[in-house]
Amino acid sequence: MKIIVVKNASELGKQAFDLLAKAVDEGAKTLGLATGSSPVELYQEIVASQLDFSQMTSVNLDEYVGLSPENPQSYHYFMNQHLFQYKPFKRSYLPDGQTKDIQAECGRYNQILAENPVDLQVLGIGQNGHIAFNEPGTPFDSVTHEVALTESTIKANARFFNSIDEVPKSAICMGIANIMAAKEIVLLAKGESKAKAIKDMVEGPVTTDVPASVLQKHPNVTVIADQAAASLLK
């Protein structure tokens, strides 16, 4: 696991962009993409660049159950706003949050991942060490599955909705085994609130209590953290 500590979020975006551009340059066909605040600066760098994804495929980690792609809180909407409207891919896949058959959708998404092996996967990390919506306790051999959102996640998301009743109660999410199948992983972390998770991921035991700790077993992981997020590392 390679650790790069940077001064601020804009440096983090630049470092992540350099790794992604190198992968594209070396012939990457499929990029694994993330949502949330962690990759925003990376996407800004991509939008400002000459990178061309028109012959490439993207796959996203997750989507809320029950939200349409037009819903501003959906991850489809987030990706369009931050990246796809400026830099379209030949094909972009996200789980279908409006599916009537969640098990079938998980199977469909596993098939997509099998047919489009990820060359570089972008990840963030949660304060409790989760990757995507894989919360503590998720088995390391998990594949795409429905995840019931924790009470704390629902409360944290409530500010984006008119009422807490509108907040999705579950999400469809790539499993840890799907994430580990990527050839290369770049994990981004910003802010003091992520410092303990980064320390546990890098220095702690490999345990399902800290889902991100499984990345210690991956042969090609780069962690890019700002000084606050890296502040507890030895």
Curated annotation (Swiss-Prot):
This is Glucosamine-6-phosphate deaminase. PANTHER family: GLUCOSAMINE-6-PHOSPHATE ISOMERASE. Belongs to the glucosamine/galactosamine-6-phosphate isomerase family. NagB subfamily. InterPro entries: Glc/Gal-6P_isomerase, Glucosamine6P_isomerase, Glucosamine6P_isomerase_CS, NagB/RpiA_transferase-like. Catalyzes the reversible isomerization-deamination of glucosamine 6-phosphate (GlcN6P) to form fructose 6-phosphate (Fru6P) and ammonium ion. Coiled coil: none annotated. It is an enzyme of class 3 (hydrolase). Its EC number is 3.5.99.6. It catalyses: alpha-D-glucosamine 6-phosphate + H2O = beta-D-fructose 6-phosphate + NH4(+). GO terms for molecular function: glucosamine-6-phosphate deaminase activity; identical protein binding. The active site is at residues 62, 128, 130, 135. Pathway: Amino-sugar metabolism; N-acetylneuraminate degradation; D-fructose 6-phosphate from N-acetylneuraminate: step 5/5. PROSITE patterns: GLC_GALNAC_ISOMERASE.
